[in-house]
Structures are given as C-alpha cells and as structure tokens.
Amino acid sequence: LVPSPDYPLWTACVNLAGGTAVHYLCDEQSEWYPDIDDIRSKITSNTKAIVIINPNNPTGALYPKEVLQQIVDIAREHQLIIFSDEIYDRLVMDGLQHISIASMAPDLFCVTFSGLSKSHMIAGYRIGWMILSGNKRIAKDYIEGLNMLANMRMCSNVPAQSVVQTALGGHQSVNDYIVPGGRVHDQRDLVYDMLNQI
C-alpha cells in the first residue's frame, strides 16, 4: 500500500521489486491525512506492507499520533511491514512534533528511512540510512538482500559520511531555518500565500 499522492519513487520501487503498488487516499479535505477506511478497503491476502511518508512529500502533512496509531493497528492486525519515509522529520514547523511510527510499534517490522539531504540542505551529497526495527525474524530474506546489495557497492560517499556525526551532533542549524525569519519557514509561507492567490 502506497499513499496517494506520493513521492513517485515509492510506486516505482514496489513495481521494480515485483510487487503491485496499490494506492490509498490521503484526503485533501482531511488535512491530507491517510484515509483509514480506504486503507482497510484495499487490504487483500496479497498485501505485504504499507508505506507512509511522514512528513509527507508532496503534501507536507504531518501525521498526528492518533493517525499513526490507527496505521499501526492495521499493520498489526494484518501483519504488514511498515516502510516509513521520514526524510523530512527535522523540517517540522509551527510548534508541531514529528513522531516516528517505529517508536509506536516495537513488535512490528519497520523500515525507517532518513538522511541529511533535506534537513541539512545537502541534497547533492546523497547521504541517508535505513533503520530496521521490530520483529526482524519475519524479514530474513529481505535483510539478506540488503546485506548483499550493501556488499556489492564498490564505494560509499566518503565525503558525505564524514559530515554525518557533525551534522547530527551539537548545534542543529536546521532549527534556525524553521522558525519565523528562517529561510525555510519564510519560503514556505511565501509559496503558501502565492498558491492561495491562484
């Protein structure tokens, strides 16, 4: 299950891996939150996983704990793997707080994706990671495949790796960007105002 609208790479990844991407609705009339009834209606015996993008790209929606809990409940009921794209987790504004869905589902196998590309304004560096948590026993083949891919890589982005510790520790300059007067905050407000004038 993949959100709609989604970041197109998710649909491509599912299809390239031999799956069939089935899209669930994120409803504009409900602050772009996932439509829980639509998710339930799309689950079949072939459904293996659910993708969430939180904060969402392209809508910008940040899912509250109540919505995340409903997704966890569905995943638990149907034994779904959760793939959670959280690359924008540090770009949360207006006093809101990002909650990682993996923290709410220690019994479920979750793959959480993040990185520095968005939060630290270094998209060209291509430095990111995935965290595997929960019940890894159900994903032995998946983990074996990840290890194989990792071992086949000839080299990593060494310059980007050298900035990870500094970027994640100490002063978080991203915090200066997301408050009033900060570049990201003010650009967001400008784009929002301009789009609403159309």
Predicted regions and their residues:
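Structural detector of well-ordered beta-strand residues that form the stable sheet scaffold
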Residues: 1, 22, 83, 111-113, ...
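Helix C-cap/helix->beta junction micro-motif
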Residues: 17, 77-78, 108
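Conserved PLP-anchoring active-site segment centered on the Schiff-base-forming lysine
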Residues: 1-14
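Active-site phosphate-binding strand-loop segment of PLP-dependent enzymes
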Residues: 22, 27-97
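Short, intrinsically disordered, charge-balanced linker/junction segments flanking boundaries
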Residues: 42-44, 69-70, 148, 190-198
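Short strand-turn motif at the edge of the Rossmann-like AdoMet-binding core
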Residues: 5, 86-88, 115-116
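Conserved core segment of the aminotransferase class I/II
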Residues: 106-185, 189-195
